[in-house]
């Protein structure tokens, strides 16, 4: 397991990262076709250049485990900032450390995610570090978290959810509808691929368009593809929304289950960490994610099956859920919706019922194709 330890007490150092494997994350901001605000550049560089702990005899109260991408680090720092603001003892220098852990999904970039196989491609190594006591809490993008957690861990906290919509980014077109027939769109998401091809069958999708946000924008600027779709939540957290050409509505592109949500896990027997995390939990987000994951669990979805699901609170305070399954080529798309009270019991039932309906409608073999 590859881990790199940083202190998170300082967030203002502009020096280059000491880890050579992270150099891409700073250099990839230099292409001219896309914009990054000065604040964003400073924040990302600071995220990657956090100072080494200066007091060797000081033991961190919390070690945060995370992936090493700029977005993952932004999420880890958001978690750190909220912990520091909520608990005075955590605001002291050296009280919180960030540990970067390289996952299977980070190591294998030459294949589509669906071809790698298995679940937890971006979480397994971090969860193992948590179970082994190498870290105290694990910060995950909830869309990457398998529906079944390791027995030794719990996930008691979801931070407030960001915008769930997808962003369209292109140098030559204002929207998907404006792309000429045969245009190539880059995405590593089967969910996006299937919905794009369902609505715009004349387009071509390159489905091994992988890498962090900066890498994908660089590939786009180099002309590898004509357009790409990225989660708006990630662009907002990186302060890179100036690169967005247009934003797709929920009707045009139903988001991934738990898109835009951050989940924080700890060991199931660590009452202190559970208490810290409970103080950060955003209950409305937690309920929505629970509903969506109940839907996903019922479908037993994997990286090979395009699945989308979104639970939100409507103007009357009710839960409105929309779910979708599709064939990878977009020729078959099945959708459903539910409405009910915004309570844990009802929302879990909504997700489960919606999943069972689509399982029945899809028929045998649909999820194995």
From Swiss-Prot:
Which branch of life, at top level?
A: Eukaryota
What CDD domains does UniProt report for this protein, alphabetically?
PBP2_PBGD_1
What reaction(s) does this enzyme catalyze?
Answer: 4 porphobilinogen + H2O = hydroxymethylbilane + 4 NH4(+)
- The organelle targeting sequence, given as a residue range: 1-46
Supply the alphabetized keyword list. Answer: Chlorophyll biosynthesis, Chloroplast, Plastid, Porphyrin biosynthesis, Transferase, Transit peptide
- EC number(s) per entry: 2.5.1.61
The primary location reported for this protein is plastid
Q: Tell me which residues bear S-(dipyrrolylmethanemethyl)cysteine.
A: 303
EC class name: transferase
Q: What does the sequence similarity comment in the record state about its family? A: Belongs to the HMBS family.
Name of the protein in question: Porphobilinogen deaminase, chloroplastic
Organism encoding this protein: Pisum sativum
């Amino acid at each position: 397991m590859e881990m790199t330890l940083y202190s998170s007490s300082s967030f203002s150092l502009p020096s280059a990262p000491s880890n050579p494997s992270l150099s891409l994350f700073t250099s990839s901001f230099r292409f001219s076709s896309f914009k990054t605000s000065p604040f964003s550049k400073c924040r990302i560089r600071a995220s990657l250049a956090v100072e080494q702990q200066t007091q060797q005899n000081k033991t961190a109260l919390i070690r945060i485990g995370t992936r090493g991408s700029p977005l993952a680090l932004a999420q880890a720092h958001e978690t750190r900032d909220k912990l520091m603001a909520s608990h005075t003892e955590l605001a002291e220098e050296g009280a919180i450390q960030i540990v970067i852990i390289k996952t299977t999904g980070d190591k294998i970039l030459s294949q589509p995610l669906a071809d790698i196989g298995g679940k937890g491609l971006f979480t397994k190594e971090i969860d193992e570090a948590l179970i082994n006591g190498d870290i105290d809490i694990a910060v995950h993008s909830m869309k990457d978290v398998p529906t079944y957690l390791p027995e030794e861990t719990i996930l008691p906290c979801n931070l407030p959810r960001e915008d769930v919509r997808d962003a369209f980014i292109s140098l030559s077109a204002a929207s998907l509808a404006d792309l000429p027939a045969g245009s190539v769109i880059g995405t590593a998401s089967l969910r996006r691929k299937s919905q794009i091809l369902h609505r715009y069958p004349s387009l071509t999708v390159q489905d091994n368009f992988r890498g962090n946000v900066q890498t994908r924008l660089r590939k786009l600027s180099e002309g590898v593809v004509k357009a790409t779709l990225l989660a708006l939540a990630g662009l907002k957290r990186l302060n890179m929304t100036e690169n967005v050409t247009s934003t797709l509505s929920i009707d045009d592109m139903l988001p991934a289950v738990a898109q835009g949500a951050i989940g924080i896990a700890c060991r199931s027997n660590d009452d202190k960490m559970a208490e810290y995390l409970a103080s950060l939990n955003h209950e409305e987000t937690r309920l929505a994610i629970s509903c969506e994951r109940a839907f996903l669990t019922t479908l037993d979805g994997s990286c090979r099956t395009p699945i989308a699901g979104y639970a939100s609170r409507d103007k009357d305070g009710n839960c409105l859920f929309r779910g979708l399954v599709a064939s990878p080529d977009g020729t078959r798309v099945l959708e459903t919706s539910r409405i009910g009270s915004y309570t844990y019991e009802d929302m879990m039932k909504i997700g489960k019922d919606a999943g069972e309906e689509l399982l029945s409608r899809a028929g045998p073999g649909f999820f194995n194709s």
